UniProtKB/Swiss-Prot annotation:
Residues 623-632 have a biased composition (Acidic residues). This is Chaperone protein DnaK. Keywords: ATP-binding, Chaperone, Nucleotide-binding, Phosphoprotein, Stress response. It comes from the Bacteria. The modification Phosphothreonine is found at T198. It comes from Methylorubrum extorquens (strain PA1) (Methylobacterium extorquens). The gene is dnaK.
Length: 639
């Protein structure tokens, strides 16, 4: 048996590694580099370039140079994120015959699996050159949040490249394998993986050679490419302001800007300021134009702050699903080139409350983990057991449109689960099994993966036939569903292969809708409560001003009236925090009024003051309550 290699097929760069004895080794490519740009280009004379040679000529050949192809793999052409990507890349994204997103050069269409296969071939050749023997088998990594279609498309890419893909492994899990290989201590780790195109976070328990994934979460359209694009947007906006020329329609200029943006981003990880100089970026009637400006780290951080913050919510969800708090995480492992950014490290440290572990190379650790898994499958690595999970719940539609889960998200894979259902009507001779993926209680709110019919059920009263539905998820995360009539033993099987995969928007909708609906309701309730507080305070303060306004100075009275006006203005908006702040300002401003009221009540022998003071006491009466929908397990399930 030949060597099994481990490949990290990345959005921006790819890397290949192999086990040498008991140690994994990253293999240098023909150019002497340990990583290879995931870029494929076609020249004027039809030559295909892969890696660094393709990257070098990208500026002069933008329409035939394909990068960040991983963002299209397993997606349909109509996917909103495909449409978004069309506006971000200089090459043409076209509709494939099967409705998937493909790319086009010189009138010829290529599937993302094909383009990815060219990069995989380069990785295969790199390994063969080092090992001096043919390589036919590999372990390939994918983002943990990749869906079934994206995993299938990645396996297809391996096949096109001449590789038998023995296992598809999740990137954060691979990183954990590499991190934990030589470490004897047990513990709970978080892998924060912010790569070129995708973000994943996984919580794992490690001990005695067992790597058990407790939960995973992520965003399949968030990564370094987006950081680069923010810089490009800033540069084009500044240039338009200065020169009045829009560079966004100039593909050559955009490609130069993209390269400059990536270079500036990398420099700003170690420097606090960098200079971007692009002479002859364009020209108009008055002559050539040059772009030259300084970009500070602070400005760059402000441009991408929301992107960095977007990584925190998946971290929060992963912790919740794993049933652990941030303080219970023993180590945070950073993976992906974008984690070199100081701001990212700072945000991770603030969230987890500890300095992230920087002992692994973020560009190589995933490929090393893939090589370790290859070693496990080959028998070279002993005493290592990897237990991964499925990222979303799977189930079927039952009577009344209810989504009945058979396999919950974050269930360890491989797994198999069966459940017996029955008919909804008398003498029903067929049932339609509709397979869904998601977290909502009603099937229609989730993603339909596929459907099939089980026919030939013998006539019987409703509720009598016994139909066994079995879900089977293999170690690659790929789904099979079987329905069987227990009376006749007739069965029908479907391998879930969505034509274009799930969109990122769909996945976010599935996971978020169940939890975020509750979160949105909570936020709406909080807004109503702070508005009520603000309005009550205005009413009480105005009443007090009319009664005791002559007891305070004109300056104090003016401050109170200004604070009332500011709060009224805030109440017209939807910003709860802003309303709270203005409410607090009015409380502070009306303190003098409270003192005057108290003094007056003392003089009059009154028992105490009312109005603004009483509102002050009540400002913390808001009770926040999280709630969860509880599934009725005893509910009778019928198909």
């Amino acid at each position: 048996m030949g060597k099994v290699i481990g490949i990290d097929l990345g959005t921006t760069n790819s890397c290949v590694a192999v086990m040498e004895g008991t140690q994994p080794r990253v293999i240098e490519n023909a150019e002497g580099a340990r990583t290879t740009p995931s870029i494929v280009a076609f020249t004027d004379d039809g030559e295909r370039l892969v890696g660094q040679p393709a990257k070098r000529q990208a500026v002069t050949n933008p329409e035939r140079t394909f990068f960040a192809i991983k963002r299209l793999i397993g997606r349909t052409y109509d996917d909103p994120l495909t449409q978004k990507d069309k506006g971000l890349v200089p090459y043409k994204i076209a509709r494939g015959d099967n409705g998937d997103a493909w790319v086009e050069a010189d009138g010829k269409k290529y599937s993302p699996s094909q383009i990815s296969a060219f990069t995989l071939q380069k990785m295969k050749e790199t390994a063969e050159s080092h090992l001096g023997q043919p390589v036919t088998q590999a372990v390939i990594t994918v983002p943990a949040y990749f869906n079934d279609a994206q995993r299938q498309a990645t396996k297809d890419a391996g096949k096109i490249a001449g590789l038998e893909v023995l296992r598809i492994i999740n990137e954060p899990t691979a990183a954990a394998l590499a991190y934990g290989l030589d470490k004897k201590k047990a513990g709970t780790i978080a892998v924060y993986d912010l790569g070129g195109g995708t973000f994943d976070v996984s919580i794992l328990e490690i001990g005695d050679g067992v790597f058990e994934v407790k939960s995973t979460n992520g965003d399949t359209f968030l990564g370094g490419e987006d950081f680069d694009n923010r810089v490009v947007e800033y540069l084009t906006a500044e240039f338009k302001k200065e020169q009045g020329i829009d560079l966004t329609k100039d593909k050559l200029a955009l490609q130069r800007l993209k390269e400059a943006a990536e270079k500036a981003k990398i420099e700003l990880s170690s420097a606090t300021q960098t200079e971007i100089n692009l002479p002859y970026i364009t020209a108009d009637a008055s002559g050539p134009k040059h772009l030259a400006l300084k970009l500070s780290r602070a400005k760059f951080e402000s441009l991408v702050d929301d992107l960095v913050q977007r990584t925190i919510e998946p971290c929060r969800k992963a912790l919740k699903d794993a049933g652990v708090s941030a303080s219970e995480i023993d180590e945070v492992v950073l993976v992906g080139g974008q984690t070199r950014m100081p701001k990212v490290q700072e945000v991770v440290k603030a969230f987890f409350g500890k300095e992230p572990h920087k002992g692994v190379n973020p560009d190589e650790v995933v490929a090393i983990g893939a090589a370790v898994q290859a070693g496990v499958l080959q028998g070279d690595v002993k005493d290592v057991l990897l237990l991964d999970v499925t990222p979303l719940s799977l189930g079927i539609e039952t009577l009344g449109g209810v989504f009945t889960r058979l396999i919950d998200r974050n269930t360890t894979i491989p797994t198999k689960k069966s459940q017996v259902f029955s008919t909804a009507e008398d003498n029903q001779n067929a049932v339609t099994i509709r397979v869904f993926q998601g977290e909502r209680e009603m099937a229609a709110d989730n993603k339909l993966l596929g459907q099939f019919d089980l026919v030939g059920i013998p006539p019987a009263p409703r509720g009598m036939p016994q139909i066994e539905v079995t879900f089977d998820i293999d170690a690659n995360g790929i789904v099979n569903v079987t329905a069987k009539d227990k009376a006749t033993n007739k069965e029908h099987q479907i391998r879930i292969q969505a034509s274009g995969g799930l969109s990122d928007a769909d996945i976010e909708k599935m996971v978020k809708d169940a939890e975020a609906n509750a979160e949105a309701d909570k936020k709406r309730r909080e807004l109503v409560e702070v508005k009520n507080q603000g309005e009550s305070l205005i009413h009480a303060t105005e009443k007090s001003v009319s009664e005791y306004g002559d007891k305070v100075s004109a300056a104090d009275k003016g401050a109170i009236e200004s604070a009332i006006t500011a709060l009224r203005s805030a109440l017209e908006g939807e910003d709860a925090e802003g309303i709270k702040a203005k409410t607090n300002d009015l409380m502070q401003a009306s303190m003098k009024l409270g003192e005057a009221m108290y003094a007056a009540s003392q003089t009059e022998g009154a028992p105490g003051a009312d109005g603004a003071a009483s509102t002050d006491e009540k400002k913390d009466d808001v009770i926040d309550a999280d709630f969860q929908e509880v599934d009725e397990n005893e509910r009778k399930k019928r198909a």
